Amino acid sequence: MNIAPSLAGLAAVSLAVAPDARAQEIAPRSEEPGAHADEDAHEEEEGEENVVQGTRSRRRIQDEPIRVELVTREEIEEKLLMRPGNIAMLVNEIGGIRVQVTSPALGAANIRIQGMEGRYTQLLADGLPLYGGQSPALGLLQIPPTDLGQVEVIKGAASALYGPSALGGVINLVSRRPGDEAEAEMLLNATTRGGGDLTGYLATPLGSGWSASVTGGAHRQDADDLDGDGWLDIAAHRRWTIRPRLFWRSESGASLYATVGAMTEDRTGGTRPGRTVPDGSFFPQTQATDRLDAGLAAEMPAGGIGTLHLRASHSVQDHRHLFGDVREDDRHATSFAEASVAGRSDATIWVAGAAFQRDLFRSETFPAFDFSYRAPALFGQIEHDLRPNLTLAASARVDFHSEYGTQFSPRLSALYKPGFWTIRASAGRGFYAPTPFVDEIEAAGLSRLEPLSGIEAETARNASLDIGYARGPFEGSVTVFASTIEGAARLETVSPTRVRLVNADGPTRIAGSELLLRYRRDGFTVTGSYVFVDASELGEGAGAPRRQVPLVPRHSAGLVAMWEEHGRGRIGLEVYRTGRQPLEDNPYRTESRPYSHVGLLGEIVLGKVSLFANAENILNVRQTRDDPLLLPARAPDGRWTVDVWAPTEGFVLNGGLRLRFGGH
């Protein structure tokens, strides 16, 4: 697909600091015990409510038995000024979530929730798998936050809600809805590392319940070899995106949402022109991506039963890879459809439905890895208020997977709100349908992988307990969680140039806790967070002892201070500390160094125009200051680099302007 010209035209038309994720803001804002828990300060000030889209029950966030963390539009705007081109920074600074770089050559990354592998995280857009059922590692870097209204995060096994791709959790990107007046925004950004972004958003009511929006963007990044070793520490890319949306709502409560999206990107990394890797060969690494998708969601009253919900989507991604002298061309496609009926009484909410998803992969170069997974499913969910402050919830799903058989995924949750306290407990089970694309293969390609044989589904059990308290300007929460993963897929070395994918012999065990403290007063917000994760697995080989899971820091913490006044501007300071991480197959060290990340953001609003500047990684932490990225010899899986455990781009300064027109 050559979609660049059409994207350029559509983008031209569309263009005519830290997200301290509201972890269900764990307790009442009111000074009266028994008031609704978790109410957001901005909801009170503006008279708005945050309704969760990702759990099907459509409750207010404070009434959800399942813990849902929320990043609001205000917090999204802070991150939009820091990194307009993608959502990596937005989700990376949510407690318990880590964006892990999986390919130093191209900068690809995935989302790890509470120490679990990134492939277990389901990324949705308005509840639809528009970025694929099993999101590729580069997908995270290709989604701009321009038109996001909120981000919902469900941690832990969520297969009972969304099937096999949600073993570790769900991140649902909810788009902005047009208001009563037409509005438009344009943002121009440039960085000291040769990056640039131009994004635009246009939304307007159309009358008779109809409204529409369109988002477009052009993004660029120049390549850079910061340490002069001939290997590009920052990959180059050129990307265009466009996404129109159509909305309709009737007075009867029926609604319709439709969207199409397109993206094209060329990304270049590996060796610089004329430079070589240690064996004397050139090793350029490139990836060209074209993505097209479409999605539809509708709901309508179903007689006296309840509400009928219909959802469907289809996405296609074509890739053209180059790994040194090996070219790999492939296509990923995901088709999804779901129908459900939801009803409610005074104390009970129920949902029942059926779903179907097909995930397809076709490789022109290595057809032995082609697959087509088909998974029809039945699911149900019920929530019951035993008392005004006590709610129980149960959900279950049965997937009839074409490759991995029948899989049952249950989840139980409870919510108790005694006075200013909020207590949530949850436990669930889920599964994941393995594919060849573990992190190492995403980074190095399929050329050295043995054809898959005898792989079984990966399964996990998960439990969590959340206790929170809030009163006046203070709030805090403590979360403890534990997961056990059976049959985790990982690579095993067969020879110096071949690897195979196998299920781990023993369980991967993860346990940890999250702590959040926040203070708000007169436009000032100070948030402190701490995360502890203990993740262990069996080592490779017969009789190997247990070891810590690589690239999972046991300790990480953050402190964010932000002042904002609408119509004037904002200023924010963020400090994050990442502890030591176990490393694997790294000849330079077995454990990473701890490091600190400091950022400073400022914005001045001058009517319809705002000017902003952001300093990121002020301490100029860079992994290549300690060790090379390049390996002395190529790894059996085909990689030429060690794993990334610290920033690779060093200090970056970005700034620009934002224009707003119309709206309220």
Regions found by a protein language model. Give the residues of each.
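Short, acidic, small-residue-rich periplasmic hinge/interaction motif at the N-terminus
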Residues: 25-78, 118
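C-terminal beta-signal and adjacent terminal beta-strands/loops
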Residues: 486, 577-582, 603-664
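Short acidic/polar hinge/loop motifs at secondary-structure boundaries
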Residues: 110-112, 128-155
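Gram-negative outer-membrane beta-barrel transporters
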Residues: 385-392, 480-485, 504-585, 656-663
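Periplasmic-side early beta-strands and strand-to-turn transitions of outer-membrane beta-barrels
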Residues: 159-160, 172, 180-181, 187-189, ...
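Outer-membrane beta-barrel signature, preferentially recognizing the C-terminal barrel domain
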Residues: 275-302, 422, 426-486, 493-520, ...
